[in-house]
Amino acid sequence: MTAIDVSVFAQSQDPDFTPALVGKPWDPKRNAMVFDAMGEIRDSFTDELIEEILASGLRAISVTCGNPRQQNQSVEQNYQSALEEMLWFDNYIEEKPQYYIKATSTADIDRARKEGKIAIFYLTQNSEHFMHDLDNVNAFYGVGQRTCQLTYNYQNMAGSGCMERHGSGITDFGGLLIEKLNDIGMMIDVSHANVRTALDAIEISKQPIQISHTTCDALFSSPRGMPDAVFRSLADNGGVVGITQMRLYITLERYGAVDLYFDHLMHAINVAGIEHVGIGSDRDHRRLVVTPEYLEEMQQEQGERFDISKVPLYFEELNSPRRMEVIWDKLLERGLSEDDVEKVTGLNFCRHYNNLIG
């Protein structure tokens, strides 16, 4: 990897930096519901970090299994990648029973809240791992998958992603897949889909669907954002939209722009309604420092898609395992009641999961 001057990221260099917005410690007596509908858990997390994440109130998270970048893989590779990662998470959770619970229903969230642990749900950010065989939906359900994102960034057999130049909507196979997912009780996610695919899926599905991690195209134009029409249609059909914490889909400003993130949350609430908005961070919960090692990690993960101009990917004020406390306090400042804040931080997605998977 070519050497990169990291001094341009000076605000991210102090590993002991504490975001100024982090206020009082989370009150465990409040026991508010905190659910990250699309986040990351890594084996590099130390016990100390996990305990800090727990102290922030997080009690449920959905994690991506497999490599969703299907254009670089065969469907067989997608199948193997998704299966191997689900089995890896099985082992990882078993090795840390003091912190984690493998989750397949909201009863596992209830248990996590009672025991002070994190319930981990499995999702895929693509449907290619089914290898165009609907019987494989049953197989992955049996392993523990509870959410399927229909597409990633490009065209697949189900529909079209947001980066496809001449994309379709839901395909004939995609319609059959939606029907199968409805029947078996696996949730449908249209994050990364193009607008037509998202609207088609909402119309075809007999069950509410979700957009676990997106932004508001009305505030900042990005391929990963969704227009208000999608939010309204989703809400009208009982779904939930999660707003991502990925800065590059919200602003080009590297620092000092965290209020724009809360603008997106409030806009989604105003359009879809307070019952239909949640959090899907699309990030892990580490405190990140931009170093050559971190940049190399990003380059390995993203390959040719890696763009140094987009670093840092996060808002510095949310760059902490205590970020959910920041979100709680800032939404109160925006005028929401504590009851409504809890809907956004977790209850809405918890209700959605309960309605669809029990």
Language model: regions and residue ranges:
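N-terminal hydrophobic targeting/anchoring segments and the immediately downstream early-domain regions
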Residues: 2-166, 221-358
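Divalent metal-binding pocket/active-site signature
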Residues: 128-131, 140-225
